[in-house]
Design a protein with these regions (language model features):
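N-terminal glycine-rich flavin-associated loop
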Residues: 8, 31-63, 81, 85-128, ...
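C-terminal substrate-binding/cap subdomain adjacent to the FAD-binding core in PCMH-type
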Residues: 139-141, 149-155, 159-366, 402, ...
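N-terminal flexible segment immediately upstream of the FAD-binding catalytic core
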Residues: 1-54, 58, 68-100, 129, ...
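Ferredoxin-type iron-sulfur electron-transfer modules and their immediate structural context
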Residues: 381, 456-461, 468-608, 627, ...
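Iron-sulfur cluster-binding electron-transfer modules in prokaryotic oxidoreductases
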Residues: 495, 502, 626-971
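Terminal amphipathic helices with adjacent charged low-complexity linkers/tails
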Residues: 243-245, 268-271, 275-381, 385, ...
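A glycine-rich phosphate-binding loop feature that marks nucleotide/adenosyl-phosphate handling sites
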Residues: 71-74, 130-137, 208-215, 219, ...
Length: 971
């Protein structure tokens, strides 16, 4: 784009960016394709959208409308101006329950809309697997449908009216009640009527899902409704700014039948036999997808429910029923009757009936994560989306699957077959290594032959994902000249200058299925450094883990723990996907300065990553941004030298030791404004942040005095009188030097349980601060000393941790540093809360707690949640008689160790914290707040008037005399 073109677009007042960072972020979507745009616009309203699109058109710059960028076929990328509607255009308004309608900005996410509608007893019917990030604009543009198409149909059927932006900048509202674009409508009606016979020939009945062909078949039946033309047009006719939508009542009840099969073909045959039961959905998942759930915390409950480890199978049909009778009783009876009929059908190896909503949600969580689970496969060969959207009639599925296998088996290819069996649509993903010429040849061969196979069945090569780049070249053979020419004329009516998404749907030679592939396929990534970390969980390689990011956008959500900076800001660069893309861009030298380790783009991506580890659990492909970040920082510091600030933060344990030699002086200096101002200027530690205070007495010194004191009370178990045995209490930096009261509370609880406690002598810092700063050699040296120290002692003694980030260092990151015997030590490491809860589960009366009514709210540490289900914390708190506990639905607190202390990160840190703060402020004032992480407690104390406790304090305070506060009495 020339400077003159940029100026013309800038003058509209719209937020438009032409910088390299933004262009690289928007060069990809969830497909295998990559096209670098000239710029990206973020319109705040329809007027701005019209102005910027008009300016681009006048400047001769093509426009690609974009939502969340979850397209699997390249719909949302282009070489001109990307107009992104998901950042600002997220308003929901004009809810009319009587009419059953609502108006939404097209940037509204499906889950956001359904959360808004649920209290009113309504939902938006079409339910796509990407509901946590898919925008309504994208769903309309693709005519999405999802699993429950048998009862809800496609998105087009739920559109009442659309507010659209034309290529000349006009903003028009279209729909059957609106008179706008009357001339255009008449021209299109004339075109479509002439093609009626050809449509009947090309599209015989029975096909439940198919690419709409600009919806001309639907428009033929409703010629006064141009929304039928726009729904499914993939941003090639106009940009959609807002939509009035039909909404549906929530079902009164649901039930689910699971049928397990020995083969995919048997499951497809059974699908045909089950359709008479009128299910809301019949979804298929196969063994390649199910195998990818192994070892993943977020899917373990689902694996247990499905009994996958004890009763393996090749294929599962998920058959869901809705009950919508006039009364709840009748609705329940309707579901029960159909579940009984399903149970009686002689299909499958075994069946399982579910009516518990929580259990059904577990099953859906596996199905919805299908794409990312499959692409999380280890190695360069991945299940690739390119023939994934072809649909046939459900009765044709068995023969269609055999046809696909006859294409792939001679080529030696495996594939996964999962998806919407009730609608005749399987998301078939052949396993290919697109880095190599041989598999690229097979890629082309499979695509060509599948297109021919779909024609034989008179099916649809695309059903709900669109045409995009991947299928444009096949449209003429799929539709024929007459229908394609009708569509081309409709394109000219709306977009005579071919401004919107040019080259897609109508081939001009620029878009082939094997063109515009991501650069890491055509030019495999190479590292300019020797990796230090093992990437031990799965991939065993930096590049392997980086390439696990398929762009699906699972990190672009507002729930769970991934990705907290995206939740706070909505910026693409703040997401796991954005960061992975920028790392890849840096390695491909697509950054300013062409330095793969140091650039503005890389700093923007990595410096705001909190290393919360949320992506390691919630990204089904297990992208580990925390490891990727620290590996890159290490390579940079090894080349350029470790900066002073990173050196200081790497040595917090040493600073604690020094500060505790003169705590009064050290604490006084923390509030001395000139000193704090100097610290901010020299090393960037914010003068406005409180810093951890130093203890008057170190915990380890208190503990020595405690051991030397005579036994007081009945619960003290040192001096060789252990009832249960020996435990090592890991006194981390903050317990030792800053928060000894937490260690004292833990001692009281452990001794009340009858344990003999010791502290590790000559222990070093766990290495977490150094690891987080990319100072990996220092972290490894500390790790080796700690492992050697602990390995030299008794090999079965549990090591109990109070700080989750220290615990995660031992159980995960020591292995990443390739420390000998790290696995052995990791097996002995346990969080204090888990240790106590496990014991009380076996012996509920082991601790004499008082009985008093109280509310407890728990904010778990990110690292704990990335490894363990935090439900055990709620169980533990509720073991205290009279207590009612809840685990807060929160992500990272935003402090993230040193991150929140940095002057340039304070505002973002506080922004990230708002989810935690809002959750706490919504609680009754008397609620006790529990936070296991020292950073979490510090952040909450800084931003509120509340001072959270550690779980050890809650337990110690609840012990009945004489055991209560025994340790403190010996201080």
């Amino acid at each position: 784009m020339t400077p003159a073109q940029q100026r013309k677009i800038w003058q509209t007042g719209c937020d438009v960016r032409f910088d390299n960072l933004t262009r690289q972020l928007y060069a990809i979507d969830a497909s295998i394709y990559q096209i670098e745009p000239a710029g990206v616009a973020f319109p705040r309203n329809a007027h701005e959208a019209g102005a910027v699109i008009c300016a681009a058109a006048d400047a001769g710059v093509p426009v690609t409308p974009r939502g969340a960028g979850t397209s699997l076929v390249g719909n949302a990328i282009g070489e001109g101006l990307i107009v992104e509607f998901s950042r600002h255009n997220r308003q929901i308004h004009d809810l009319d329950l009587e009419k059953g309608s609502v108006r939404v900005g097209t940037g509204v996410v499906l889950d956001q809309l359904n959360a808004f509608l649920k209290p009113h007893g309504f939902c938006f019917g079409p339910d796509v697997a990407t509901s946590s990030r898919a925008t309504l604009g994208g769903m309309i543009a693709n005519n999405s449908s999802g699993a429950r198409c048998p009862i809800y149909g496609t998105t087009a059927g739920h559109v009442i009216s659309l507010e659209i932006v034309m290529a000349d900048g006009r903003v028009e509202t279209i729909g059957p009640r609106h008179e706008s674009l009357r001339a255009e409508r008449a021209r299109i009606e004339n075109l479509v009527r002439r093609a009626g016979a050809e449509m009947a020939e090309r599209w015989p009945p029975g096909l439940i899902k198919r690419w709409p062909g600009y919806g001309i078949e639907k428009f033929l039946r409703a010629p006064n409704d141009l929304t039928k033309i726009l729904a499914g047009s993939e941003g090639t006719l106009a940009a959609i700014f807002s939509a009035e939508l039909h909404i549906s009542p929530l079902p009164r009840c649901k039930g689910m039948g699971l049928i397990f099969f020995a083969s995919v073909t048997e499951a497809m045959q059974a699908t045909v036999e089950l359709l008479d039961l009128q299910p809301a959905a019949i979804e298929h998942v196969d063994r390649p997808l199910l195998d990818q759930t192994k070892g993943q915390l977020q899917f373990q409950a689902a694996r247990d429910l499905l009994e996958l480890d004890s009763k393996p199978c090749e294929s599962i049909l998920i058959v869901e029923f809705y009950g919508d009778g006039p009364t709840a009783t009748r609705a329940q009876s309707s579901v029960a009757e159909r579940l009984a009929l399903l149970q009686s059908r002689g299909v499958g190896l075994r069946k399982k009936i579910l009516t518990d909503p929580a259990q059904m949600d577990l099953v859906w969580s596996v199905r919805k994560s299908g794409l990312s689970l499959l692409t999380g496969r280890v190695g360069a060969s991945k299940p690739v989306a390119f023939i994934e959207d072809a649909a046939v009639r459900p009765a044709q599925l068995p023969e269609y699957v055999r046809g696909l296998r006859s294409i792939m088996e001679p080529l030696g290819l495996e594939a996964s077959y999962y998806g919407h069996a009730a609608s005749g649509l399987l998301h078939v993903r052949p396993v290919l290594d697109l880095h190599g010429a041989e598999d690229l040849r097979k890629f082309r061969q499979v695509a060509d032959q599948t297109s021919a196979l779909v024609r034989q069945f008179k099916g649809s090569l695309s059903a709900e994902h669109g045409v995009g780049i991947a299928r444009t070249e096949y449209l003429r053979e799929q539709l024929g000249d007459e229908l394609l020419d009708v569509l081309r004329e409709i394109k000219r009516v709306f977009d005579p200058r071919d401004i919107f998404n040019p080259g897609k749907i109508f081939s001009d030679g620029r878009h082939k299925i094997d063109s515009h592939l991501r650069e890491n396929f055509t030019r495999p990534l190479e590292l300019p450094f020797q990796p230090r970390l093992a990437f031990a969980f799965k991939d065993r390689s930096f590049i392997g883990n980086l390439e696990q990011c398929n762009g699906c956008g699972g990190c672009l959500k507002q729930s769970g723990i991934m990705c907290p900076t995206f939740m706070a800001t909505g910026g693409e660069v703040m997401s796991t996907r954005g960061r992975a893309n920028i790392i890849r861009a840096a390695l491909e030298l697509r950054v300013q300065g062409r330095d793969p380790l140091k650039s503005e783009e890389l700093d923007a991506a990595l410096s705001n990553c909190l290393s919360c580890k949320g992506c390691t659990q919630e990204c089904p492909s297990n992208v580990n941004l925390a490891l990727l970040k620290t590996e890159l920082l290490h390579a940079r510091w090894r080349r350029d030298g470790l900066p002073l600030r990173e050196r200081i933060f790497s040595n917090l344990d040493l600073l604690g030791k020094i500060g505790c030699t003169m705590p009064r002086l050290a604490n006084g200096s923390l509030n001395f404004r000139p000193l704090r101002a100097a610290m901010e200027k020299t090393v960037g530690i914010s003068a406005d942040r409180s810093l951890p205070r130093y203890a008057n007495e170190r915990f380890d010194r208190w503990f020595r005095r405690h051991l030397a004191a005579p036994t007081v009370g009945e619960g003290k178990a040192h001096c060789g009188a252990a009832i249960r045995g020996h435990v090592i209490l890991w006194d981390d930096t903050f317990v030792r030097y800053h928060e000894p009261h937490i260690g004292i509370a833990a001692v009281a609880v452990l001794e009340a349980l009858g344990f003999q406690i010791s502290l590790p002598k000559n222990r070093r810092c766990c290495g977490r601060p150094a690891f987080s700063q990319g100072n990996l050699d220092a972290a490894a040296a500390l790790a080796k000393q700690n492992v050697d120290l602990l390995a030299a002692g008794r090999p079965t003694v549990p090591i109990v941790f109070l700080e989750p980030s220290c615990w995660s260092m031992f159980v995960e990151d020591y292995r990443e540093l390739n420390i000998a015997r790290a696995d052995e030590i990791a097996g002995r490491c346990v969080l204090f809360e888990k240790f106590v809860d496990d014991l009380l589960a076996r012996e509920p009366g082991a601790l004499p707690f008082d009985n008093r009514p109280a509310r407890v709210a728990i904010h778990p540490h990110c690292h704990a949640k990335s490894i363990l289900d935090p439900a055990f914390m709620k169980r533990l708190a509720e073991r205290l008689p009279g207590r009612r506990a809840t685990v807060l639905d929160t992500a990272c607190c935003g402090m993230a160790g040193a991150f929140g202390m940095l002057a340039e990160k304070c505002d973002l840190s506080a922004q990230v914290a708002q989810r935690v703060i809002n959750a706490i402020r919504s609680l009754p004032s008397e609620t006790e707040i529990i936070a296991s992480g020292t950073s979490c407690r510090h952040q909450i104390s800084d931003l509120t008037t509340i001072h959270p406790k550690h779980m050890a304090e809650l337990l110690a305070d609840s012990l009945q005399p004489p055991t209560a506060k025994t340790a403190a009495q010996n201080a």
